[in-house]
UniProtKB/Swiss-Prot annotation:
It is a multi-pass membrane protein. Belongs to the NALF family. Keywords: Glycoprotein, Membrane, Transmembrane, Transmembrane helix. Glycans are attached at residues 77, 97, 153, 178. Its main location: membrane. GO terms for cellular component: plasma membrane. It comes from Danio rerio (Zebrafish). It is found in: Membrane. The lineage of its organism: Eukaryota, Metazoa, Chordata, Craniata, Vertebrata. This is NALCN channel auxiliary factor 2. GO terms for biological process: calcium ion import across plasma membrane. Probable component of the NALCN channel complex, a channel that regulates the resting membrane potential and controls neuronal excitability. The chain crosses the membrane at residues 42-62, 362-382.
Length: 401
């Protein structure tokens, strides 16, 4: 009895000692656990708030971009803008279809976009005196200069920066035909039974090449609509990729210079612009690549770039309503290229601001999550330490027995 009572007393003393020892250890852990719960709740609230605000911000940004594209000013007075200074957003590019002009450009550009099929027949009827035309050419004293001035009023449908005069000057053998300027003039004004046949055949050859280029562009446009519906980069948007791809197609089918040009470059350099501006597309998994081997390859481009040989083309991305100032409206500096530098437009600047804002939000979110993880780890370590302190004290009576 005495021994048992003594043991019981020692056990009670041990329990009291345990209470006295563990009390200052458990109390801070309990308080820190409450603090950690509040921190976790706050971190979760901030996380969902950041996601919601970012979603609303992106929606608002998309509406602003569409509003900017809708109200983008076109070239109503091209001569005045050429004198006062040109801006990138004034070029009036239609992102949906690069082969058509805006409604404000139709009237001012109607004469230059006259039907190509009637170009030779109208000139032949004018020679015969059966019809009067606003482009008067004196038949007995016709000169190559007057002949070219007449054909400068006719441009291609897809590669609209090129006129028939540009093609007659530099591309004299389309599809194996003889389309030299001297041969066309002799065919039109020789007085033979087949007057105008050579002119019509050359115009049809140019039209067929233009249609082939448009078909290739439509295939590429379907590809961009499928894989690149949204802008994929701050420095290179989808419409810039489409524009430079169209310029490359026209340079490949019609490697000729233009009369109105601000800057010249080898025609094959457009291929490098497409590689630098457009992303790399994997056709098997609908993903975009920003590194690795490009899917658009330029055969023999490096040799031609170093030697600077080959025909020169006008560095024109797109033109305005008037062909006389269309080259001034050209975006001759594309971002991310190897030889050009372009000012960031308002859309690119807004994309940059949105990207910086998203990065800032992401950094803050990562910091909160990291702080929460460290706090939870500290709480688990505190709980483990308190258990390690309690277990040896409970084993004291067993050791004494």
């Amino acid at each position: 009895m005495i021994t048992g009572a003594w043991r019981c007393g020692r056990k009670l003393d041990a329990e009291l000692e345990i209470c006295r020892v563990t009390e200052p250890i458990d109390k801070p852990c309990a308080e820190s656990e409450k603090v950690q719960r509040w921190r976790m709740s706050l971190a979760s609230l901030l996380f969902f708030t950041a996601l919601l605000s970012d979603h609303l911000w992106l929606c608002a940004g998309g509406k602003l971009r569409s509003r900017d594209r809708t109200h983008r000013r076109t070239w109503n007075n091209a001569s005045h803008d050429a004198q006062t200074g040109l801006r990138d957003e004034d070029c009036g590019v239609l992102l949906s279809n690069l082969t058509e002009n805006g409604p404000d450009c139709v009237e001012a550009d109607a004469r230059r976009r006259a039907p190509l099929e009637s170009a030779c027949s109208t000139l032949y009827r004018q020679k015969s005196g059966s019809v009067s035309s606003s482009y008067s050419v004196t038949v007995p004293t016709v000169s190559p200069h007057a002949f070219l001035e007449y054909f400068r009023n006719f441009s291609l449908s897809f590669c609209d920066a090129l006129t028939i005069a540009d093609l007659l000057e530099s591309m004299t053998s389309p599809d194996g035909l003889n389309c030299s300027l001297t041969h066309i003039i002799r065919d039109l004004f020789s007085g033979g039974p087949e007057d105008g046949d050579a002119c019509s055949a050359c115009v049809h050859a140019y039209t067929r090449l233009d249609q082939h280029a448009q078909e290739k562009y439509e295939e590429f446009d379907a590809l961009t609509r499928k894989y690149m519906a949204d802008d994929y980069s701050v420095r290179a948007q989808t419409h810039l990729c489409q524009v430079v791809y169209k310029a490359w197609l026209c340079a490949e089918y019609f490697p000729v210079p233009q009369r109105q040009c601000v800057r010249w470059l080898p025609c094959r350099h457009y291929c490098g612009e497409v590689t630098a501006t457009c992303p790399f597309i994997l056709p098997d998994n609908d993903r975009l690549l920003y590194a690795g081997s490009p899917s658009f390859l330029c055969a023999g481009f490096q040799e031609e770039y170093l030697s600077s040989q080959g025909p020169d083309c006008c560095d024109v991305r797109w033109s305005g309503c008037d062909s006389a100032v269309g080259a001034a409206c050209a975006l001759t500096h594309l971002p991310g290229s190897f030889s050009f530098h372009r000012r960031l437009s308002s859309g690119a600047m807004s994309c940059t601001n949105r990207l910086h804002g998203s990065k800032l939000k992401l950094c803050v979110l990562v910091l909160f999550l990291l702080h929460t993880f460290i706090s939870i780890t500290t709480l688990q370590h505190c709980s483990t330490g308190s258990l390690e302190a309690i277990v040896p004290l409970e084993e004291v009576p067993m050791r004494e027995e």
